[in-house]
Amino acid sequence: MTNPLYKKHVISISDLTRPDMELVVATAQRLKAEPDTRLLKDKLVASCFFEASTRTRLSFETAVQRLGGNIIGFADGGNTSAKKGETLADSIKIIGSYTDAVVMRHPKEGAARLASEFSRVPVINGGDGSNQHPTQTLLDLFSIHETQGKLDGLNVAFVGDLKYGRTVHSLAQALSLFNCRFFFISPEALAMPDYICEELEEKGIQFSVHETMEEVMPELDILYMTRVQKERFDETEYKHMAAKFVLEVATLEGAKPTMKILHPLPRVDEIDVAVDKTPHAYYFQQAENGVYARQALLALVLNETV
């Protein structure tokens, strides 16, 4: 079978088709069940993190090494020639000449797309500002499939910061290809952006806006939590808004036994720690799944057949 992801840049989730996503999920399932330490043998991957990261950077590095590859790079753009004024384009040209692929996180929206225009090797976006985070979406899709046995026709709620949360933008776009039904629950000031809602309307995808989790809880298959970002509000306004979007054990009353809670992490106060002990909590397993999803993507991008 032809591998459509071979040597492909992965900058936005919209760069991937539904079959591409299904291929990554299936490959992640296989690698989780049957580890393969040879898929990146003799491959060298650059890990270029111009912005702070814990899970994304470490899971990519783990993924490369578990597949038998090698990784070089940096975790702080302040320690690179960017501090001397070197352009991103020049940096990526050089880094791409050393390696077989570049994984990059950058605080500026559009930086990953720019990097792909100057790189002779595939660029994988590890997050660019509040724009896109496609590999988070792939691990989210893998986690949803792991818990629900499918991706099609699910009821999915997004809670918290839907305006600036790049993970919810990417995931909503991806799941729209699987005819899911969406429930958006957020402060009015942090509502899902118009462009996402317009895309969903054009595709005929059902979605609705709600003030509380409780009113839709019995319908949900997936509850996707995000944090309300404190830095975007004054103290009084933040406390009022954040308190409305805290998930507690009592909030889960009436939930389907199979409903799972996801969160891109880090968690602050939006999920009470008591929820961790419920059968609905899946966010720590979700983070672990990041290794398998990123293994799958790297293997597909760097091998003609997998």
UniProtKB/Swiss-Prot annotation:
Q: Which GO terms describe its molecular function?
A: amino acid binding; aspartate carbamoyltransferase activity
Q: Where does L-aspartate bind?
A: 84, 166, 227
Q: Which reaction does it catalyse?
A: carbamoyl phosphate + L-aspartate = N-carbamoyl-L-aspartate + phosphate + H(+)
Q: What is its EC number?
A: 2.1.3.2
Q: Which GO terms describe its cellular component?
A: cytosol
Please give the superkingdom of this protein's source: Bacteria
Q: Does the keyword Ubl conjugation apply?
A: no
**Record Pfam families:** OTCace, OTCace_N
Q: In which pathway does it act?
A: Pyrimidine metabolism; UMP biosynthesis via de novo pathway; (S)-dihydroorotate from bicarbonate: step 2/3
In this chain, carbamoyl phosphate is annotated as bound at 55-56, 105, 133, 136, 265-266
List the coiled-coil residues. Answer: none
Could you tell me the Gene Ontology terms of the biological process aspect for this record? Answer: 'de novo' pyrimidine nucleobase biosynthetic process; 'de novo' UMP biosynthetic process; amino acid metabolic process
Q: What Gene3D superfamilies does this protein's entry cite?
A: Aspartate/ornithine carbamoyltransferase (3.40.50.1370)
UniProt keyword terms in alphabetical order: Pyrimidine biosynthesis, Transferase
User: Oligomeric state and partners?
Assistant: Heterododecamer (2C3:3R2) of six catalytic PyrB chains organized as two trimers (C3), and six regulatory PyrI chains organized as three dimers (R2).
Q: Which family does it belong to?
A: Belongs to the aspartate/ornithine carbamoyltransferase superfamily. ATCase family.
UniProt function note: Catalyzes the condensation of carbamoyl phosphate and aspartate to form carbamoyl aspartate and inorganic phosphate, the committed step in the de novo pyrimidine nucleotide biosynthesis pathway.
Its name, as the record gives it, is Aspartate carbamoyltransferase catalytic subunit
The gene for this chain is pyrB
